[in-house]
Amino acid sequence: MATSSVRSVRVSRAGELWSFMVIGALCTAAYAILYTLLRHGGLTPGSANALSLAATMGANFAANRRFTFNAAGEPLGRQLASYAVAYLIGLAVSSVALALLESALGHPNGALDTLAGVTAGLGATVVRYLLMRAWVFRSAVDALQGGTVAEPRMSPPRRAERARPGTMSVRWPRPELVVLLLLAAVLNLWALSQNGWANEYYSAAVRSMSTSWHNFLYDSFDPSGLMTVDKPPLSLWVQALSVRAFGFHPLSILVPQALMGMATVGLVYDLVRRRFGRVAGFVGGLVLALTPIAVAMSRHNNPDELLVLLCTAALWFTARALEDGRTRWIVWAGVMVGLAFETKMLVALMVVPGIVLAWLWVAPRGRLAAARQLLAGGAAMVAVGGAWPLLMTLTPAGDRPWISGTSDNSIWSLIFGYNGLGRIDGQAGGPGGGGGPGGGGGGGGGFFGGSTGVGRLFNNALGGQAGWLLGVALVGGAGILVASRLRRSDARSGWLIATGGAFLTTAIAFSFAKGIFHPYYVSLLAPFVAALIGATAGHALSGERTARIVGALALVGGMFTELLVLHNLPGQFGWLRPLLIVGTLIGALVVLAATAPRVRAAILAAAMFLLLLAPASWAVQTLGHATSGTFPAGGPASVAMGGPGGGPGGFGAGRGGFGGPPGASSSQRGGFAPPSGTGSQGGFAPPSGSASQGGFAPPTGSGSQGGVAPPTGAGGGGGPFGSDGSSLTAIAKYVQAHGGGTIGVSSQQGAASSIIASGMKVAGLGGFSGRESEVSVKWLAAQVRAGHIRWILADSGGGLGQDGRVGSSKLMAAVEQACTKVPSSAYSSSSATATAGTLYDCLGKADALTVLSSN
């Protein structure tokens, strides 16, 4: 009987929360509209906030009185007076919150200002709910819990009603999960269209892949199907299918990414909830939703968002497997890792060590059975992850595109070299920075993610993206692991080994990777950090003395890492630092000493609120500017735009043509700067040199137009070709008038804007920036013979071989000897177009190129 009563109260509370949320969502929407209109009408934020709340107060009161608390029979006057007091308290809370948000965000305008107002309004809504339940409608709530009043009309049906024969069982979503998903939806979708094509490199590939199933299957960057993208195709397949369904538009590409971000938040919530409870799950999901780089990547089209989702899903399936020991869950975990491999190759394996160790340690059905189950999961991973590489291997080279990022056209070179060990040991070539559309830089951090070492994740390039609360995750995760004593019977052990293992493996690899490392890579850390923080919160609320110690130490650890990040971000949140120190230390002491669960929970929530202020502010500020370019970053515009500059598609490598012939000086168009020289237009500056137009500045130098700025520098103006593509457009008109055909240029990035704009048949034969791939003369001869390519544009700053590679020099020498040079006057009399480069017509020159390829 008692159990039935408790269950009834739980169902009633769930219905109450659900009803309140529906009414609150409608009132919040009305509030947002009113607030926006009043702000545009010239009112101050405080006045607009007060009037908007007043206008929606009556409707909110009436609806909650009738539907949520079923208190229509109670005295109206007393309830209305109490609600008015609750409203005034909510107004005070929202006004203070709005003032803090406006100060933290630097008094923004436009969409960011509206979002700050809505956030303050939501805070007031939470306060009003608590007051309504505990005071305004207290008698109705007590009567409902005592079983004397019928349930509210808007509450979900009882379990018994849902299970009636002949009806479908309905599981209502948990209110806290709905809140998390709504928050993630706002952060991921708000003003999404301002990001345009985001990374034009991938958007161009999506257009090419959406027009041809051959291009789709073989991951082709260009419409002609000559060169692949330098990443596997899974994330681009999702975007290309969306484009096929809804048309080629920025939102067709970006909305799937935003939905992936929401799904990851939901997965983290459930991953933590299954082991540490709903409050812990909510904290984990909230931390992820408010992580700046997680917000930025959910609003961008780089493949990392799908990678993060799939790796999180692998951990979720592992957690399910640890619960009941079933083989199917561990097989599904292997499938998720395999799909992640098809998204970004070897980096997907970061989660594997933790999963393997957790499964072998816990071994729900014995060690021998665990080994067999791991073999099944590993087979699934290899089968799924190896499917596309096997396809590329078995397809004859002449029937598929050249594999970008390689010099031997081998998918295995891409896997283990450019996208694999080369990123760890520093042997992989690649671009240092690129401009973003609309003059935005590629993202804070520029060439690298800072010096390698244990402090890398807290530096000025990476710390603000995901390093704020690393101390909570580190200390909390370690503390729970010690408390569990790694007992196989303790359900926390396997969970912590899997999740903590994924976190440690990724953090160590990212901290010491010597290769090209960009700030947005740390988005893979975000769900692991969030899950460990959620677990720490749930553990600290358990009431055990060791749990209180872990909670207190975790708060201090979080304070330390956040202060370290703030130290590396001068000028950011100066007002927060003393408040953070005092508040967190007091909170840690109270959590350690308090025995009352409610007191401990309230203080822990307040301390977490302090720790989340800075990252949440950065997450919200990400919505105030375009997240575009090659290297996205979260945070204010001054940080996110702090990388190399560029116009639409601009890239420091120059205009997209090939480098000049052997022997050309660095001052000539298309030449290579000598090792000790200074880069001129199209050249590459040495480590101690300085870059001019189209060059690359050293990591410690300052970039000029198109150069690469240091991590905290401001971007320049971008390379000349990428600015509007007008030079290539003029050449394309000439090509179209003389038989058409594909134009071969150096940089895929430089060709991206033209492909996006018109689907122009232009192929970047040098890879992403023009210096990652070395197509052979023999391959070029075969493409010319088959009619797949006819024209070659040799231009300044083409960049095929920063160090003057033999392959690129030999290729251009062969083109010069075998193909016919087209006078620049033939396609334009303008000096701007004339300097676009030298166009070569290779029609009928396949035999000559073949002869030269054997020399």
Where are these regions (language model features)?
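Membrane-interfacial entry segments at the cytosolic side of transmembrane helices
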Residues: G366-A379, E544-G551, F573-I581, A593-F609
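Juxtamembrane helix-capping/reentrant segments at transmembrane boundaries
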Residues: A71-G90
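Alpha-helical transmembrane segments of multipass membrane proteins
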Residues: C27-Y31, Y35, T56, N60, ...
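Transmembrane-lumen/periplasm boundary regions of multi-pass, lipid-linked membrane glycan transferases
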Residues: N199-N215, P223, V352-A483, T561-L569, ...
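Luminal/periplasmic acceptor-recognition loop/helix of membrane-associated glycosyltransferases
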Residues: G717-A752, S758-D803
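Membrane-integral, polyisoprenol-dependent glycosyltransferases
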Residues: R153-A428, G439-R548, G557, Q621, ...
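Membrane-interface starts of transmembrane alpha-helices
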Residues: G15, L43-A55, P108-G123, W172-E176, ...
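Membrane-embedded alpha-helical segments of integral membrane proteins
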Residues: R133, W329, A333-G334, L339-A340, ...
